[in-house]
A protein has these predicted regions:
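Catalytic and GAP-homology cores of small GTPase regulators
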Residues: 184-188, 192-349, 376-463
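Hydrophobic residues within the alpha-helices of tandem HEAT/HEAT-like
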Residues: 15-26, 41-46, 76-88, 118, ...
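Helix-start/N-cap signature of alpha-helical segments
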Residues: 4-16, 26, 30-35, 51-55, ...
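Structural recognition of alpha-solenoid helical scaffolds
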Residues: 18, 22, 33, 37, ...
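Charged/polar, low-hydrophobicity segments characteristic of intrinsically disordered regions
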Residues: 5-12, 51-59, 114-121, 167-177, ...
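Extended alpha-helical scaffold segments
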Residues: 141-150, 568
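Boundary/linker elements of alpha-helical solenoid repeat scaffolds
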Residues: 1, 17-29, 63, 67, ...
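Amphipathic alpha-helical segments within extended alpha-helical solenoids and repeat-rich scaffolds
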Residues: 1-7, 22, 31-54, 83, ...
Length: 574
């Protein structure tokens, strides 16, 4: 099972250390394992402390089982920092997950979690977890910074000194309680300025050239180099469009389908096969909405359900494992007739793939329905008296074409269902189970578990702007909190250097809004510090600026950025 937030620190440390070592030595073989480890273990552990703080802020008491939360979170965050320092980790996550239509956006999830964990709870002092979260964000920025430094002749710090100090370690940071007013969201959430609605419908239709999104991505793929970078950028843009389309479908399938047709994501002459492929492969779909759509008795929806079932390969897979896979993409509706209709189609598909496994499709249907009933009985807390193995066997007597099922088949199914629940709820959080691990192993056996060749230095630079656009806002926000709450001069200087580094990367990629935002943030600190000193000590602004080290540091950073990157300042001059 996956590590829980209150897992004993030695166990968490051993698991995280083991995986870090495996990734460092066997990277090319661990694509699917990395995705599972990040989404099921590491990211939830990093977020555990934030969830606990939110509970405490809402007045809920914490029990003793939460005692290991902070230490386990620290171990997880240290593991993230170590992984982010690996040469290919950031690009691996971005290229192979965020740019893959069939995968979760692991890199974006990681950045969001680090961003949220970097901000202390209301009124709380800066903790070690907050600082480690900032270090994780800076480690990602450092990856981009190396490429920027390599291709830029002006790699030296505008403040002087070694440019490598711009993103130096911040473990020595100290904090004093204060109220953050840094111009960013208080919860550390990313303020993504990118417009999700991007291209016009006509432009996207022309780009797709009649192909569905998955055929288009396959046609645009390349093994390496600039061609691969271009293909992945197209895939990433298309994935965002699919997420928007999924949101429309989640609100109203009736309106969502015309929206997708308008953008060329579904053909004008709507086919059940195209809709089924969208329902199976598109990211961001609400499983409950998908289940209701597939269970609809209308003729077109029934055809979609049949096409949906045909997208699965059930050959040489046991009935219960195939059923798990089939039900993974949607939530079974609550209405008995809809459940029956879905299981009937599943049974026909399963029997077609495994004609020697049972007498006929009706037999597969009856056993499938019995499995659903067993699953509900075994895992519903309201059911006090659980079904026994003998009762399960008795319930299925004579249902295999009038004959009994082999006892070993029913025993194996019973044990599998009782020990490993088929999740029938719309649970967005990924879970580790025997069946999920079995799916990973099957995918590895057919060659789907390997990373592509790592990008060379030139190709890697092609992803820098995209990675930086995701990470700059939470990094700047987190560093601003560190800057505001710090009392140590070295910490202030490190924070300033980090700001300047982010500005340098933004300038290199001509992200003028980012440079404007950074300068405005530093100027806000200058104004606040000067006004506070004047009000408290009745000093003139010039004297106040000279006596307050934090205000001086902020002014120094603002002028350094303006001096070095003035060509990329727009509103920041005002």
């Amino acid at each position: 099972t996956s590590l829980k937030p209150n897992a004993a620190p030695p166990i968490a440390a051993a698991a995280c250390g083991c995986f870090t070592m495996l990734y460092a030595t066997m990277r090319s073989e661990l694509k699917l394992q990395l995705e599972m480890f990040m989404r099921i273990v590491l990211i939830p552990l990093c977020a555990a402390g934030k969830n606990k703080a939110s509970t405490a802020a809402n007045g809920a008491s914490s029990n003793s089982s939460d005692g290991f939360n902070s230490e386990t979170q620290r171990i997880a965050l240290e593991t993230v920092v170590d992984l982010c320092r690996q040469p290919h980790f950031v690009t691996d996550c971005y290229m192979h997950f965020d740019c893959d239509l069939s995968k979760a956006c692991v890199f974006e999830e990681l950045v969001s979690t680090l961003s949220a964990s970097a901000f202390p709870a209301n009124g709380a002092k800066l903790s070690g977890a907050n600082v480690l979260s900032v270090e994780g964000l800076l480690a990602i920025v450092r990856t981009v910074s190396r490429s920027t430094t390599a291709e830029s002749s002006s790699a030296s710090s505008p403040l002087g000194g070694d440019s490598s100090m711009l993103l130096g370690e911040s473990s020595g940071m100290k904090a004093a309680p204060s109220t953050a007013t840094n111009g960013f969201a208080d919860d550390g959430s990313m303020q993504n300025d990118e417009e999700e609605e991007g291209d016009s419908p006509a432009a996207l239709r022309d780009e797709l050239r009649g192909l569905d999104p998955w055929e288009y991505v396959k046609a645009s793929a390349a093994p390496s180099g600039i061609a691969r970078a271009r293909g992945l950028r197209k895939s990433r843009a298309l994935k965002r469009r699919l997420v928007v389309a999924a949101e429309h479908f989640n609100r109203s399938p009736k309106k969502g389908i015309p929206y997708m047709q308008e953008y060329g994501l579904l053909p004008e002459n709507l086919s059940a096969k195209a809709v089924a492929k969208f329902l199976k492969l598109a990211p961001g779909l609400d499983k409950e909405v998908v289940g209701e759509y597939l269970g609809d008795p209308k003729d077109f929806q029934v055809e979609v359900l049949k096409e949906y079932a045909d997208l699965f390969n059930f050959e040489n897979v046991t009935l219960d494992k195939a059923l798990r896979t089939f039900l993974d993409g949607f939530k079974l509706p609550g209405e008995a007739q809809k459940i029956s209709r879905i299981l009937e189609v599943y049974a026909v598909r399963y029997y077609g793939a495994n004609p020697n496994s049972c007498a006929d499709a009706d037999s597969a249907y009856v056993l499938s329905y019995s499995i659903i009933m067993l699953n509900t009985d075994a895992h519903n807390k309201q059911v006090k008296k659980k079904m026994t193995l003998e009762q399960f066997i008795r319930n299925n007597r004579g249902t295999n074409g009038g004959k009994d099922w082999p006892k070993e088949t029913l025993v194996a199914i019973f044990d599998s269902i009782v020990t490993d629940e088929i999740r029938l709820t719309d649970d967005a959080a990924p879970k580790l189970s025997n069946s999920a691990w079995h799916d990973v192993m099957r995918a590895c056996e057919v060659g789907e578990g390997k990373f592509d060749a790592p990008p060379d230095e030139f190709e890697s630079r092609q992803y820098d702007a995209d990675v930086f656009s995701l990470v700059w806002a939470p990094t700047a926000a987190a560093v601003a909190v560190i800057f505001e709450r710090a009392t140590d001069e070295d910490v202030l200087e490190s924070s300033v250097e980090a700001f300047v580094a982010v500005a340098r990367i933004a300038s290199n990629h001509r992200m003028t809004d980012v440079v404007d935002h950074l300068v405005a943030t530093m100027c806000a600190f200058v104004t606040k510090g000067a006004q506070s000193a004047v009000e408290i000590n009745l000093l003139r602004p010039g004297v106040a600026l000279g006596e307050d080290i934090k205000t001086r540091s902020a002014a120094k950073a603002a002028f350094a950025v303006a001096n070095a990157h003035g060509d990329d300042l727009r509103r920041g001059w005002c």
